[in-house]
Amino acid sequence: MNTKICVPVFEKTAPEVTESAGRAIDAGADILEIRIDGLQNPGEVNIRELIEDIGFPVIATNRSPVEGGHFSGSEDERIKLLMAAAEVADFVDIELSSAREDIERVTGSARRSIVSYHNFRETPSLEALLRIVRMAKEMGDIAKVAVMPENLADTLVVLQLLTFEEDTVAISMGELGKYTRVAAALFGSPITFASMGRGTAPGQMDVDVTRKMIGELMPED
């Protein structure tokens, strides 16, 4: 299975992050998303040391409130923490809505980068999503879009997007779009997101269930 299953780790303290990371690894995660914005006092945490201590593939994310995150500091502080994480994380995720200069600073420092777009209100048209993805890939290695469907047809737009674009993570959120987190693997998505009971986005399924369902659906080599 080429699609990596990523489990987000969203905790208030560094020890809790380390503990949850261990449980996610034991549960079968291929990669972890460390949500810096979940930390109560991220400025007091040595982000580099935290990621190195975990010793497992990591996506470092410091999600802005505009796109569903919880970071309460300034934008400058948010970017500085991402820059610190970029030195040791396998991937760094930065939002397309960030200032272009900040995106270029972060992606330029990262080993590999994800430029992401989140829309919790609706699913833009396929044409609009294609423009978003191509813009994201001009600056990052992987584009990520996560959008909210109003009907089943909206969920199909997300899968259709994956037929046009490689190096793209595309997610239809919520209960309606839950199946796309599994189906995306059939369309070549490099990463899909699962949880350990407490998801960080609507529609995330348990990591074990996600792996089994992808295994059942993927054709034999």
UniProtKB/Swiss-Prot annotation:
The active site is at 118 (proton donor/acceptor), 144 (schiff-base intermediate with substrate). It comes from Methanothermobacter thermautotrophicus (strain ATCC 29096 / DSM 1053 / JCM 10044 / NBRC 100330 / Delta H). Homodimer. Involved in the third step of the chorismate pathway, which leads to the biosynthesis of aromatic amino acids. Catalyzes the cis-dehydration of 3-dehydroquinate (DHQ) and introduces the first double bond of the aromatic ring to yield 3-dehydroshikimate. Belongs to the type-I 3-dehydroquinase family. PANTHER family: 3-DEHYDROQUINATE DEHYDRATASE. Keywords: Amino-acid biosynthesis, Aromatic amino acid biosynthesis, Lyase, Schiff base. InterPro entries: Aldolase_TIM (IPR013785), DHquinase_I (IPR001381), Type-I_3-dehydroquinase (IPR050146). One of its GO terms (molecular function) is 3-dehydroquinate dehydratase activity. The keyword ATP-binding does not apply. GO terms for biological process: 3,4-dihydroxybenzoate biosynthetic process; amino acid biosynthetic process; aromatic amino acid family biosynthetic process; chorismate biosynthetic process. The keyword Amino-acid biosynthesis applies. It catalyses: 3-dehydroquinate = 3-dehydroshikimate + H2O. It is an enzyme of class 4 (lyase). This is 3-dehydroquinate dehydratase. Its EC number is 4.2.1.10. 3-dehydroquinate binds at residues 33-35, 63, 181, 200, 204. Gene3D superfamilies: Aldolase class I (3.20.20.70). Pfam families: DHquinase_I (PF01487). Pathway: Metabolic intermediate biosynthesis; chorismate biosynthesis; chorismate from D-erythrose 4-phosphate and phosphoenolpyruvate: step 3/7.
